Amino acid sequence: SPTGNWAALKDWAEGNEYRDLMESKLAGLRYQNTAARLPKMLARKLFMKGGRFYGSVTKLQNYRSCPYQYFLRYGIGVEERDTGEADYLDYGNYLHAGLHQFGEVLKSQNRQWRQATDEEIEKISEDITEKITPRIKADALSSDQSAKYTRRVLDQTFRRALQKFRQWSRQSGFDTVDMEKEFYLRISASPTDSFTLTGKIDRVDTDGRYAAVCDYKTGSPNLSLNEIMEGLSLQLITYLLALSKTKDTKDLLPAAMMYIYLHGRPKSISVPPNGIPHAKEKENTNGIFLNDPDVLRTLDSQSGTDDGFIGVSYVKDGSVKKTSPVLTAEQFEALKALTEKILIRLYSRLESGEIAIHPVKNGTLSPCSYCPYRSICRFDPALPENSFDYISKVSDKTIREKLDEEMKRNGKENL
């Protein structure tokens, strides 16, 4: 029979000089593209230098997106080859540094964005960019004509952001009180184990009672309740959690957590005939806000109009539209409590040595799309042992109901 013939051939090959060749060929049939759980002691050595986890919330988000990618990047330190060219990360750092330095100039003079003049925006921004340009990838933004054009786009984006900040400040009762505010958030994972999250909040605005945390973005990400609950978008809510556990800010109530868009991505902008760069204007922010029209109109007196900077709308009686991205004060508290549980769960998985090749798939988005380690992990959804971690779509309404249930369960219906 055919089976008997193959068995006889296999026995013959194993008995002579073809044995090693046959074993190497058959190994491919037995290969499983998986990553075994690391021994706990090894995991702690790789991920917890000094015996304790001390890192950013972004790291835990990255771990949630793909444990194996995290292992390669932060565990054994596999790095991408540096081309020497400025990239989107460098563009973001350029704009972040510029906005921070301009804000520090105003802060040193006890002034707000609303008080900056056109002349100051022009002159101070020029001085700042002259100082920070050489620091970007060994002056990569001055290397050739293409790089110089990129810098022109970035400089225009920087000035445009300053003008928008000034206009928003003029129609807001909130003041910017901190920029790149450092925080250290220690969380107890168990009675005998804890970890510390560190980071910098790009901007904190407050009216004395309420606080808005802001993160500058050169892209246009959307802040999603579903992604927060799935552990994929924990940055902003962790900022609010950190403020609530810091002595000088613990009494501030959440007014908003939002991304502020810095438009003008160089490689997506074509050179117009007159040689002057331009950028398509879109919405200014994206976030989740407090369901309190008085607070929101203090944050932005033009909210709900074409001149508003925050994405909320109102009905005729003045209340906030149900379709707006808002939470009640109680729901914000519940979300912070759940976020702490999510962070603990991610830390516990990491600490236990779980490094599965199991990337998330959120709609059409997956970390595999931009992962530099594809040739190492060789993830292939066609293999039976490889599969995506699919993210379920849960409506904001359902999540709000879950937050209400969480508050009742904790007996915290009232702040």
What is each model feature region?
Residues 1-415:
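Structural signature of nuclease core domains in nucleic-acid processing machines
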